[in-house]
């Protein structure tokens, strides 16, 4: 071990991507907090376009922000020192300690970024442990820890476990099938000094009577010499998954609800967690629309953020979905864009530094839908910050969120008297409300729908146009709901899993 620790770290490894590492690490954070400890969540390297911005304006994966809330801490970029944000075409933006440091193609990543990534990880650890001297690190691995072709350059699994001499938990997803092969195969591919770090096994997503798996537990423990810490059942209430595919496959929620929200499933969608507050609202049905599908007549259309706005807009143009959106607006449809979605609604998108285009020379893709009189220019420096601003529509109130974008948008002209600034700070968003009470607008403020009162008034605007009664503000706000779900998750974890032998 190369670093002084008062408490042995716990590390959650998985037999594969999607095994359940994120939620289990999240539950362990709350579990230890209940025991009077101070857990410190940490994921050395994460790949995700679902990001959060901390109070210092630095980017980190949303899953580590969730884990920090579970631990009772304020999110900080040191908890996720290396973040890779896929841009498509085997290319990712590289974020070190919250700041963008470059772009890398997958084939060159380890050669170009391994050493600096490892230094960022060690620096993040040092800063966290200096401020939380009595805390216990709760580490989350990434994917499988035994990808033999990549293992020598793996920043965030067994290299980190050995560096910290962590007690490791191996999570296997029984829902996928082949759970015995998952466990035995993963351990067999480890070196002797790596195997000895595995102190427990968790069987995740089990359906049915656990008594039916007792012989399986006995066999696993006999073959591996490692105790099975418990069997976690399939949980009905879950959080935003790390892999966007899991969420996007929820094509219809609350079928038959009074209001239908359609969401464009952009090929390079980012920050889909902006939409989470709607998924637990029983008055709303959510429907995903892929390029090439029919838009239909939803009550409102949301165009979410994109990691590559110009390419995603080009996809909408090629498949005819842009024309469908324009026709929907002409017929009185309600449209709202977030970040990249706002940019697409404008007249033009200029990329002089090729932040979005990546060697694209085409200019046709730079024409927006022209539903808002704004022009977007992508700058060399990304703007990231938390914000609290006064919103002016559909009513006046202070709301919170965060910015995370290269593009800057400005009004081309203000001759259209219908357009208004959403905020006192006009560069954060605009809206046009037409005589028939339909609207087209958008904002750069991620997390805007987390503001419960504003979200309800926004929905009531749509309900009013449809002739429905206004709904009251939810008694349970989004933050309280998240806390309740964290407690429910931890209750289920504590009922089924025993980690006491790992923390003594």
UniProtKB/Swiss-Prot annotation:
The active site is at 339 (nucleophile), 446. Transmembrane segments: none annotated. Keywords: Cobalamin biosynthesis, Glutamine amidotransferase. InterPro entries: Class_I_gatase-like (IPR029062), CobQ/CobB/MinD/ParA_Nub-bd_dom (IPR002586), CobQ_GATase1 (IPR033949), CobQ_synth (IPR004459), GATase_3 (IPR011698), P-loop_NTPase (IPR027417). The keyword Plastid does not apply. CDD domains: GATase1_CobQ (cd01750). Belongs to the CobB/CobQ family. CobQ subfamily. This is Cobyric acid synthase. The lineage of its organism: Bacteria, Bacillati, Cyanobacteriota, Cyanophyceae, Synechococcales. PANTHER family: COBYRIC ACID SYNTHASE, DETHIOBIOTIN SYNTHETASE.
């Amino acid at each position: 071990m190369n670093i002084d620790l008062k408490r042995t770290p716990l590390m959650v490894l998985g037999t594969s991507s999607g095994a359940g590492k994120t939620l289990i690490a999240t539950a362990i954070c709350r579990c230890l907090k209940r025991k009077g400890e101070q857990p410190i969540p940490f994921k050395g390297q994460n790949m995700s376009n679902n990001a959060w911005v901390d109070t210092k304006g630095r980017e980190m994966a949303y899953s580590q922000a969730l884990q920090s809330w579970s631990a009772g801490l304020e999110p900080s970029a040191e908890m996720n020192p290396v973040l890779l944000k896929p841009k498509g075409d085997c290319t990712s933006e590289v974020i070190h300690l919250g700041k963008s440091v470059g772009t890398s193609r997958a084939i060159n990543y380890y050669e170009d970024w391994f050493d600096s990534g490892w230094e960022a990880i060690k620096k993040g650890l040092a800063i966290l442990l200096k401020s939380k001297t009595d805390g216990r690190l709760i580490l989350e691995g990434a994917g499988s820890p035994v990808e033999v072709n990549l293992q020598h350059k793996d920043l965030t699994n067994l290299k980190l476990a050995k560096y910290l001499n962590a007690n490791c938990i191996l999570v296997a997803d029984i829902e996928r099938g082949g759970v015995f092969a998952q466990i035995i195969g993963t351990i067999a591919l480890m070196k002797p000094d790596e195997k000895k770090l595995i102190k427990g096994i968790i069987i995740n997503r089990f359906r049915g009577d656990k008594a039916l798996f007792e012989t399986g537990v006995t066999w696993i423990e006999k073959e591996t010499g490692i105790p099975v810490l418990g069997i976690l059942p399939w949980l009905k209430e879950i959080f935003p998954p790390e892999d966007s595919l899991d969420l996007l496959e929820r094509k219809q929620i609350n079928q038959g609800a009074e209001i239908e929200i359609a969401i464009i499933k952009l090929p390079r969608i980012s920050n889909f967690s902006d939409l989470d507050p709607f998924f637990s609202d029983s008055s709303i049905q959510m429907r995903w629309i892929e390029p090439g599908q029919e838009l239909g007549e939803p009550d409102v259309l949301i165009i979410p953020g994109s990691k590559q706005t110009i390419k995603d807009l080009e996809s909408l143009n090629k498949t005819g979905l842009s024309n469908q959106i324009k026709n929907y607006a002409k017929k009185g449809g309600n449209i709202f864009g977030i970040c990249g979605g706002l940019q697409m609604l404008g007249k033009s998108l200029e990329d002089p530094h090729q932040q979005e285009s990546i060697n694209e020379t085409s200019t046709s893709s730079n024409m927006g839908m022209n539903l808002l009189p704004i022009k977007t220019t992508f700058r060399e420096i990304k703007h990231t910050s938390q914000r609290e601003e006064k919103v002016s529509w559909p009513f006046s109130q202070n709301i919170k969120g965060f910015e995370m974008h290269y593009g800057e948008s400005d009004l081309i002209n203000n001759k259209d008297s219908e357009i208004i600034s959403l905020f006192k700070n006009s560069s954060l968003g605009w809206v046009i409300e037409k005589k028939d009470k339909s609207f087209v607008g958008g904002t750069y403020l991620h997390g805007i729908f987390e503001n419960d009162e504003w979200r309800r008034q926004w929905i009531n605007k749509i309900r009013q146009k449809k002739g429905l009664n206004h709904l009251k503000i939810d008694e349970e706000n989004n933050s309280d709901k998240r806390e309740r779900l964290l407690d429910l998750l931890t209750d289920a974890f504590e009922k089924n899993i025993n980690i006491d032998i790992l923390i003594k």
